[in-house]
Amino acid sequence: MAATLGETPRGKGLHYTLWTFQVLLALLFLFAGVMKLVLPAEKLTEQSTQFSAAFLRFIGVVETLGGLGMVLPGMLKTKTGLTPLAAAGLVLVMIGATMVSYQMKGMEGAAVPVVTGIVAAFVAYGRWRLAPLPDRGGRVR
């Protein structure tokens, strides 16, 4: 079996970089997602009047699950193939967030979701191809 980049000395740095980005994304999306789930509906729709509270709660669920998907599979060493899928799902969320932010606030408002989406895309590709996470048996899926 050929070694993946994550198993080489050069790949160790990539592995740690990906983990750092995964933890940061997890914290960001867990915070954003949980806030959308626990805030009262009136507060939730104050800033974003174009979306219903139910839709924003759905986005909160997606963000929370995506945040968990960034770290739990790697920490538990099970279903590690879910991490790049979670990151790819968060890229889709950030594409939508970029469009909404651009419409509401212009280019300055769209910068944060663009950068977040790029980081999530890097994690998705990195964990899919460059340095996949091994499962408990050491197998890379």
Sequence positions of predicted segments:
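Membrane-interface extramembranous regions
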Residues: 2-141
